[in-house]
Swiss-Prot record:
Protein's name according to its UniProt entry: Probable uracil permease
Matches recorded under PANTHER family: PURINE PERMEASE C1399.01C-RELATED
Name of encoding gene: uraA
Record's function text: Transport of uracil in the cell.
UniProt topological domain (Cytoplasmic) ranges: 1-13, 62-64, 112-123, 171-177, 248-260, 298-300, 354-364, 401-416
Main location: membrane
Periplasmic topology ranges: 38-41, 83-90, 146-154, 199-223, 319-331
Intramembrane segments: 365-400
Protein's cellular compartments: Cell inner membrane
Length: 417
């Protein structure tokens, strides 16, 4: 892989590294805290586990890859279902085991090469599953934007959520430079200010919260049903991880798929995810926003991500930060979520397009159709006390159909890359 850009001096003094690291955390901050706020997890804990997860990832990769790990959007709906069905502790127990998916894929890549992932999880499998992740969350976004199950008046809810959505859209489309990377942050700020003028903010939790507070740690509990439900969901973000590593490789001009190797980056992501769940935080994933910031600032030094992780851990011990985040009205988050969740579905569509999946071919048509119908229609399968439904069922069905249905004779067999 060649680098089109002139080389960048990696050596910087610690003060500059710390400042740029804080800048990287700021870029990731909006999306990082959005996941716990939506799912009911603790925002300070999410900051803590993002920092720890990034440090563990760096440990596994020899601190060679300038990438930041934080809360994964792919797990929002499963966490919401798990918390409602089994509680936070059991949901965390199931999420601990999702790291095993990364471990298994890491081993597969180590033995068979990176091309093995493409054969087991081709775009026709991953694409529709990602679409279902986004579409399954759409009703949640709309309900929050309309102020359902809350004390907000309909007119206030629609006004604030639409203003938030339009702000986020505007920044994402028209902003330049670093501003373009933080549309979620701008949307939250505008929505929050509007809520202030409407008298919808209660600052009492912030006043009561201490400056220093240990993040809320949840000890995981393990239940087979929760584990089996959550395991398959890790497939989509694990495969997307490959795209994240390819993106940062392109930005820096270094082939991280070869050194430190995809098997090590997958292992690092898996350990980060399991560690986060052990502490009560959401699973981690690579952040494209931070990769974009690396490209803009041309700071390719992996030590910057060490500083970003340290900042995240330090801020997680400030009780007033978590209390302030808890005051963000759900109608503000609803406006942002309508764009975010829709964009997840678009990523799934993009996966199919980039993979040049012929949807008119009978085999591909059957796989995509069944997965989409199962996901949107709410299909579930019971095995005694164990139930498969939603994204987990869709992932299992997509994999099985891909393995069972014969490939067209004129379909070229991809070689290991």
């Amino acid at each position: 892989m060649t680098n089109q850009n002139p080389p960048v001096l990696l050596e910087q003094n610690h003060a500059k590294q710390a400042f740029v690291g804080l800048q990287m955390l700021f870029v990731a901050f909006g999306a990082l805290v959005l996941v716990p706020l939506i799912t009911g997890l603790n925002a300070n804990t999410a900051l803590l586990t993002a920092g720890i997860g990034t440090l563990l990832f760096q440990l596994c990769t020899g601190r060679q890859v300038p990438i930041f790990l934080a809360s994964s959007f792919a797990f929002i709906a499963p966490i919401q279902y798990g918390v409602t069905t089994w509680g936070i502790a059991t949901t965390m127990g199931g999420l601990v085991f999702t790291g095993l998916v990364y471990f298994a894929l890491s081993t597969l890549v180590k033995i068979k090469g990176a091309g093995a992932l493409q054969k087991v999880f081709p775009p026709v499998v991953v694409g529709p599953v990602i679409i279902i992740i986004g579409m399954g969350l759409a009703p949640v976004a709309v309900d929050m934007a309309l102020g359902k199950n809350s004390t907000y008046q309909y007119n206030d809810a629609v006004f604030v959520s639409m203003a938030t959505l339009l702000t986020t859209l505007g920044v994402a489309v028209f902003a330049k430079g670093m501003m373009k990377l933080i549309p979620i942050m701008f949307g939250i700020v505008v929505g929050y200010i509007l809520c202030l003028f409407l008298g919808l903010i209660n600052f009492q939790p912030v006043i009561d919260a201490p400056w220093f507070s240990v993040p809320e740690i949840t000890t995981p509990e393990f239940k087979l049903e929760a584990i089996l439900y959550l395991l398959p969901i890790a497939i989509a973000p694990a495969v997307e991880h490959v795209g994240g590593i390819m993106a940062i490789s392109s930005v820096t001009g270094k082939d991280f798929l070869q050194k430190p190797g995809l098997h090590r980056t997958l292992l690092g992501d898996g350990i980060a995810t399991s560690a986060a769940s052990f502490l009560g935080g959401p699973p981690n994933t690579t952040y494209a926003e931070v990769t974009g910031a690396v490209m803009l600032t041309r700071n390719f030094n992996p030590k910057i991500m060490t500083w970003a992780a340290v900042w995240a851990i330090a801020i997680s011990f400030c009780g007033k930060v978590g209390a302030f985040l808890s005051t963000i009205p759900t109608i503000v988050m609803g406006g942002i979520m309508m764009l975010v969740f829709g964009s997840i579905a678009v990523v799934g569509m993009s996966t199919l397009i980039r993979g040049k999946v012929d949807v008119t071919e009978a085999r591909n048509l059957c796989i995509i159709s069944v997965v989409m119908t199962f996901g949107i229609g709410g299909m579930f399968v019971n095995f005694g006390e164990v139930s498969l439904k939603g994204i987990s069922l869709c992932a299992v069905v997509a994999i099985l159909l891909n393995l069972i249905l014969p490939k067209a004779k004129n379909t070229p067999i991809e070689e290991n890359r």
